[in-house]
């Protein structure tokens, strides 16, 4: 009984325990996509590692959580892959996974030390408006719309998708400067 009391006092930030990247990508309840290559899974894991070390240890155990944190926690990722290697596809998967992981939190803004309910923004910036709309954003939007897990948790607009908990993914391009003032967690430069 005392252990239950201590467990209740713990600062649990999660509304739902997130699934691993492979389950998220391939699972019918999530994206339901074909499996990725090992390199693509590593890219997705590195791009989407947003959790604190202590939370990873709680989910995965001391050794695995620490190793995961050390391997995948990055501030910047540069993909230098050839044409047709799946950079845009992998980026849309990673962005989807980040949004999923944010929505698993009770209050994503508070988790990152921001005021409760504060905006969290993710953006893809392409060279021009057509590329912004037809490459990354189209693939991202399709994944979200087809995923049973995201049903009822978003509102799609022409150049953005607003999710519950004040999370927004924007499609931008370098021809305009309206991206100032965003609370960016992720920026994908295409």
Question: Where are the language model's segments positioned?
Answer:
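Phosphate/NTP-binding elements of NTP-utilizing enzymes
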Residues: 1-190
């Amino acid at each position: 009984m005392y252990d239950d009391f201590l467990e209740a006092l713990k600062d649990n930030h999660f509304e739902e325990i997130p699934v691993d990247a492979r389950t998220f990508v391939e699972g019918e309840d999530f994206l339901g996509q074909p499996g990725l290559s090992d390199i693509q899974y590593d890219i997705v894991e590195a791009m989407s590692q947003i959790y604190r070390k202590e939370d990873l240890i709680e989910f995965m155990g001391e050794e695995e959580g620490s190793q995961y944190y050390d391997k995948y926690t990055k501030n910047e990722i540069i993909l230098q892959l050839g044409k047709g290697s799946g950079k845009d596809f992998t980026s849309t998967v990673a962005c989807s996974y980040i949004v999923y992981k944010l929505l698993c939190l009770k209050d994503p803004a508070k988790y990152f030390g921001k005021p409760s309910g504060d905006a969290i923004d993710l953006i893809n910036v392409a060279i021009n408006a057509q590329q912004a709309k037809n490459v990354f954003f189209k693939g991202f939007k399709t994944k979200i719309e087809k995923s049973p897990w995201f049903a009822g948790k978003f509102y799609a607009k022409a150049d953005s998708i607003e999710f519950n908990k004040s999370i927004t993914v924007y499609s931008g391009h370098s021809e305009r400067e309206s991206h100032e003032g965003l609370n960016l967690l992720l920026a994908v430069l295409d």
